[in-house]
Every structure is written in C-alpha cells, then in structure tokens.
C-alpha cells in the first residue's frame, strides 16, 4: 500500500504513491516535478 500526498515517509524507500516522491528535507510525500 502506497503513501499519499503529505504522508510521512522514509527517503529512498519508494513508499509514496505514483507521481509522488519522498522529500529528503521534510520526510513526507510530495508531488514529483
């Protein structure tokens, strides 16, 4: 199960849903630019 926008995550683990990426700075899923 992927994590949605704004959910906490661990950078590099690919936990976020499609189109999202884990922010190294804030440790939450943000929109992939």
Swiss-Prot record:
User: Subcellular localization, per the record?
Assistant: Secreted
Q: Which domain of life is it from?
A: Eukaryota
GO-annotated molecular function? ion channel inhibitor activity; sodium channel regulator activity; toxin activity
Per the entry, what this protein does is: Potently and reversibly inhibits some human voltage-gated sodium channels (Nav1.1/SCN1A (IC(50)=72.0 nM), Nav1.2/SCN2A (IC(50)=75.5 nM), Nav1.6/SCN8A (IC(50)=115.0 nM), Nav1.7/SCN9A (IC(50)=52.7-129.5 nM), Nav1.3/SCN3A (IC(50)=306.6 nM)). The hNav1.7/SCN9A channel inhibition occurs without any change in steady-state inactivation- and conductance-voltage relationships. On adult mouse DRG neurons, this toxin is approximately 1000-fold more efficient to inhibit tetrodotoxin (TTX)-sensitive than TTX-resistant sodium currents. In vivo, this toxin exhibits analgesic effects in mice pain models.
Q: Which residues carry this modification: Leucine amide?
A: 33
This chain belongs to which protein, by name?
Mu-theraphotoxin-Os1a
Q: What are the disulphide bonds in this sequence? A: 2-17, 9-22, 16-29
Span-the-membrane segments of this chain are none
Please, what other remarks does the record include?
Shows low or no activity on hNav1.4/SCN4A (IC(50)=7.7 uM), hNav1.5/SCN5A (IC(50)>10 uM), hNav1.8/SCN10A (IC(50)>10 uM), hCav1.2/CACNA1C, hCav3.1/CACNA1G, hCav3.2CACNA1H, hKv7.1/KCNQ1, Kv11.1/KCNH2/ERG1, and hKir2.1/KCNJ2/IRK1 channels.
Tissue specificity comment: Expressed by the venom gland.
Native organism is Omothymus schioedtei
What domain notes does the record hold? Answer: The presence of a 'disulfide through disulfide knot' structurally defines this protein as a knottin.
Keywords of the record, alphabetical order, are: Amidation, Disulfide bond, Ion channel impairing toxin, Neurotoxin, Secreted, Toxin, Voltage-gated sodium channel impairing toxin
Q: Which family does it belong to?
A: Belongs to the neurotoxin 10 (Hwtx-1) family. 14 (Hntx-1) subfamily.
GO CC entries? extracellular region
Fetch the Pfam families from UniProt.
Toxin_12
Subunit and interaction comment = Monomer.
């Amino acid at each position: 199960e992927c994590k949605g926008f704004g959910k906490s995550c661990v950078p590099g683990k690919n936990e976020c849903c499609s189109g999202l990426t884990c922010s190294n700075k804030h440790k939450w899923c943000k929109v992939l630019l």
